[in-house]
Amino acid sequence: VAFFLRKNKEELKVARVYNFSAGPAVLPEEVLKEAADEMLDYRGTGMSVMEMSHRSKAYDTIIKEAEADLRELMNIPNNYKVLFLQGGASQQFAMIPMNLMKNGVADYIVTGQWAKKAYQEACMYGKANKIASSEDQTFSYIPDCSDLPISEDADYVYICENNTIYGTKFKTLPNTKGKTLVADVSSCFLSEPVDVTKYGVIYGGVQKNIGPAGVVIVIIREDLITDDVLAGTPTMLKYKTHADNDSLYNTPPAYGIYICGKVFKWLRKMGGLEKM
């Protein structure tokens, strides 16, 4: 019996499943092994990252290293903030209009279920215009976005850059005619090099490409972070709250950010986004 159990344990060690789920999805085995090695004692602290205070020096190093590595991977300019938040990508459907709808108007390009949900949410906070859509053919294509009817007073133009359900992706970013581009990149985050300067906001839940569920990363240009938000916006849903506190206004999804940081280091070790 002992031999049988030992043999099966050995088999389990190599019986990794290739999980092609849209998310949560597979993580690098090297990252999981490192996390396992540090589970009970993170670098001599005598505790797991799950147990340590997010105000501690050890955790401050973890979150700062994670941001620094992400900035290097994506070549994020200094005039952009990196926020590690909670609530998933779906919470951004509300945070974006709450924080960015200065004129109460935004344009949406609806190319799948996630863009549709974001559009529907934005309608609750102002005038959301559907300026292009592929819903007429079950979201099976990306509409021509070279000459869109951009609203003159639009605060931003919104897209979901990659659509896992329908297998479509923006090969070329839409011509926003000078308006701020906001993009949900949850399912293509860190899959290829990106020119961050073409966006005002890039965000995504990490569970598809980067780490465990529970973290959303928001990369936002600093001029978009203001106190001028919709009346009644809760403190926790203001980008400025989190930007002013380096993502530590409240207890963050600490362990998830720790794993994300390990994935960033793994990606750098693999050669960066150019090798992806």
How would you label these PLM feature ranges?
Residues 46-92, 99, 113, 121:
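Conserved N-terminal alpha-helix of the aminotransferase class I/II PLP-enzyme fold
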Residues 16-67:
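A glycine-/small-polar-enriched, mobile loop at the entrance of the PLP active site in fold-type I
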Residues 90-157:
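PLP-dependent aminotransferase-like
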Residues 182, 196-207, 216:
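Conserved active-site segment immediately N-terminal to the catalytic lysine
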Residues 23, 122, 133-189:
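Active-site phosphate-binding strand-loop segment of PLP-dependent enzymes
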Residues 1-13:
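Short, Lys/Arg-enriched N-terminal segments with co-localized hydrophobic residues
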Residues 28, 206-276:
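Active-site C-terminal subdomain of aminotransferase-like
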